Each structure stands twice: as structure tokens, then as C-alpha cells.
Amino acid sequence: MKPHHTVLKVVSMVDAGCKYVIIGHSERRAMGETDADVNAKVLAALDAGLTPIMCCGETLEQRESGITTEWITMQIKLGLAGVPEDKIRKVIIAYEPIWAIGTGRTASPEQAEEVCESIRAAVRKLYSSKNARAISILYGGSMNDKNAFELLAQPDIDGGLIGGASLVPEKFVKIIEAANQPNE
């Protein structure tokens, strides 16, 4: 995407009253969106006063090859390039395991936590421990009313990026209720 197109779309979003924007979703990446495109959009969103929700994730092949952490760390580093330290806390990062999107499969709570912990570690390395603790990390791989509580109980999962489950009000309400349960 050309830089001026990004700026025009961001201005239109702000004019429409948007506050958040999902960037780097697996569907966009499948259509050819690159890490450089994601970075340009993150920077444009921040400049416009929007809160970017930057997605990152791995394919099943990458997971099975044992390169998940390296892949995610690279996406974080490239996606956040040039984001000043005083704006990093405004960025929300969503872990979106591509192999789980729309397949009915989901990462186990332990798998999701492992990746979200590596996301926080990447932010710590790029910025600081204080900023790493302050950012929000979402899980977005087929979270539903049945698995939300266990996923949201993980220490490095701060919320969910809900897809299909948000279209069924009864299921979405159960996810919201799970998010409001105290973690012990």
C-alpha cells in the first residue's frame, strides 16, 4: 500500500469517529500485506491519534518447525520500527495463530501464554520492562465461550480479539463474562 493511501484512510477513519484500528490481520497478510505495510499503518495510526491493534502470528508449518518465537519476535520488531517510546503503550498487540483462525482449532492456554510471553519479552528488549508490563496483549485464535476463561487466566493474555464468536450474542456475552472473572 502506498503511504499516501494509508494517510487518507486513517484521516477518514478518524473523521468517522474510529478510535481503534486492526492492523496486520492474517486475512490482510494473506492478501500480500507486508511487515513494512504493517509498520507504516501502525505509525500512521499513532500519528492520527488512533490506537493500533497490531496482529502477529505463525502458520502451522512455522509452529511445527519450532520457529514460532523467532517469527513472532521478527514481526514485533518490524511492525514497531520507529514507534517512539512515549507512544508504545498506546499499541495493542494481538497474537493471532494463523493455524487457528476459522478452523475451530485453538492454541492451548499454555501455547498461547508461551507466545504472548515472548511478545512481552520482545517489547521489553525493544523498549523497557516498564513498557512491556504496560502494553496490552490480546489472544485472537478462535477464542470462544468454551475456552475464554482458561485463555484469559494466563498472565500475559490481557484480552481477546474475537472473531466469529462475536457474531452470536449469547456466546459473546459468555466471553465478556469470562473476561470479567477474577483470575486466581
What residues fall within each predicted segment?
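Active-site loop-to-helix "anion-binding N-cap" substructures in soluble metabolic enzymes
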Residues: 1-184
